[in-house]
Amino acid sequence: FNTLDRMDVIQPRLMEYVKGGGTAIVQYNTSMRNQPKIGPYPLEISRDRVTVEEAEIRILAPDHPLINGPNKITAKDFKGWVQERGLYFPNKWDARYTPILSSNDPGETPKDGGLLVAEYGEGFFMYSGYSWFRELPAGVPGAFRIFTNMISIGKEKPKNTNLNSVEKKN
């Protein structure tokens, strides 16, 4: 949102997509004095960050669909992350967002806004300050599992998930 000058024009169209059943995932944005409207509901991005790559990540909403499918997310999924956990976490948000994960550097206060999810119309909007741009290229398995859940939210589980039952053609 802070890299495109026309986000004020694009954002309403993006929210219509979400409202109609789409999923939008916004990855971290720098904190700016005049923040554009990012999501369907108010949120304020801070300069909060978690730089210790081994910092504990706590699951705040263990029953949320984002944590339970298609992959069951556990503490194991946060092992092996590289460089940092994340940055530019929101520090204020509308009650219609659900905070999913929390983390903090040693001696710091919890940063509960690292992954926020809101239902909007028929779809889902997510804001994440976690460093997917580092974890996915590094091949961190847990990052792939979590991001898969993010892009799958609201989708029906496939009827046949056993890939071994698919016949191979010669």
Model-predicted segments: where are they?
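A glycine-rich, often tryptophan-bearing local segment used as a flexible ligand/cofactor-contacting loop or short
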Residues: 2-80, 128, 142, 146-148, ...
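Intrinsically disordered, low-complexity segments enriched in polar/charged residues with Gly/Pro
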Residues: 2-3, 74-76, 87, 100-106
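Generic detector of bulky aromatic hydrophobic side chains
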Residues: 28, 87-88, 132-133
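Active-site Gly/Thr loop motif
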Residues: 84-94
